[in-house]
Amino acid sequence: DTSVSRGLGDVYKRQNTGYAVLRKKSNEITMVECGLISPKKGKEVSERLYTIFFETNNLIKKFKPEMLYVENVFYGKNVQSAIKLGQAKSSVMLAAEHNNIVSKEFSPREIKQSIVGNGSASKEQVAFMVKKIFKLDDKVLKKNDISDAIAVAWCGINRT
């Protein structure tokens, strides 16, 4: 009998929140779905955060992950950016808690180490490994947010 686990990885940014749902059966990890949550530009902050919460909540209901994995961003280029990232991250984690799903945070270094084998890897190296592992084309990874979310989910599903 083999166990199956599902993990949802989220990467939250100012404009888009990337997500990836991975499935692990025995030692095989497969991609179930990946994409972007894109709140409408020009909306109030509360509306944008609600969209992130609502869409993450829908993903949880659809895929029923056992865990939700997020990147622990502990610095920002400036204070405003750090605050906005923290707000978006909170929306994602609240959706997990709302559904009684445990969320686990990983540092950027841990995520890069897990997918590339080098904690100091560049965004390009992360995207390259994601493409290679899951045999994805450039259209799927049109935004770094998607490859980052896949890397977060990969890290999480391999460590839990």
Roles of regions detected by a PLM:
Residues 60-73:
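Proline-aspartate-enriched helix->loop->beta-strand connector
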Residues 15-46:
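Short glycine-rich, Thr/Ser-proximal phosphate-binding strand/loop in the N-terminal lobe
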